[in-house]
Design a protein with these regions (language model features):
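Short coil/turn segments at secondary-structure boundaries
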Residues: 43-46, 80-84, 105-106, 129-131
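Conserved redox-active cysteine motifs that mediate thiol-disulfide chemistry
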Residues: 27, 33-53
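Thiol-based oxidoreductase modules, predominantly thioredoxin-like and allied folds used
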Residues: 60-78, 86-99
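Eukaryotic intrinsically disordered and solvent-exposed regulatory patches
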Residues: 15-18, 39, 52-56, 76-77, ...
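Non-catalytic, surface beta->alpha helical segment in thiol-disulfide oxidoreductase systems
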Residues: 91, 95, 105-152
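Plant-skewed but cross-kingdom recognition/interaction modules and surfaces
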Residues: 12-18, 22-23, 41, 63-64, ...
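A short beta-strand-turn-helix
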Residues: 4-29, 54-57
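Hydrophobic beta-strand anchors of alpha/beta hydrolase catalytic cores
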Residues: 30-31, 67
Length: 156
């Protein structure tokens, strides 16, 4: 994902800016296409937040995983409200960044919410991340790491 987002800055739900390259290097990345006005997005986001917390905030060492929210909201204010209300402590592509539209086209996003799991190169591991989390919970992450070929010994 560094290949796609390298040189860009991402924003946290608290409004802090981070360099994408440093934040995403050697990680499995989940691109989360969603919007606060969308009931299925509002339904899935708390589950994704718990999944993220278990892998990143509570695990020692933290899992090589990061979520990048790609908003389909109608305004920057709507995006920030959705992030502050329901999102985990993950990252987001700024609302004004035109890459939001390019990513929707690149990953063929036609409905939301959609969770696309990608390798560091941006190559798709699965575009069924939402379903896999719902059906398999944390167990799906090990498969993603193996396919992504990052931190071979993470589960070691």
């Amino acid at each position: 994902m560094v290949d796609v987002l390298g040189g860009r800055r991402l924003v946290t739900r608290d409004g802090a800016w981070v360099e994408a390259e440093a934040a995403l290097q050697n990680k499995v990345v989940a691109l989360y296409f969603a919007a606060g006005r969308c009931a299925p997005s509002r339904d899935f986001t708390p589950l994704l937040s718990r999944f993220y917390e278990a892998l990143v905030d509570e695990a020692r060492p933290p899992a090589p995983f990061e979520v990048v929210f790609v908003s389909a909201d109608d305004s920057a204010q709507d995006m920030l409200a959705f992030m502050s209300e329901l999102h985990g402590a993950w990252l987001a592509l700024p609302f004004q960044d035109p890459l939001r539209h390019e990513l929707r086209a690149r990953y063929r996003i036609t409905t939301i919410p959609k969770l696309v799991i990608v390798k560091p190169s941006g190559e798709v591991i699965t575009d069924k991340g939402r379903m896999q989390i719902r059906e398999r919970g944390l167990a799906c992450f090990q498969n993603w790491v193996e396919v992504a070929d990052v931190f071979r010994n993470f589960f070691g």
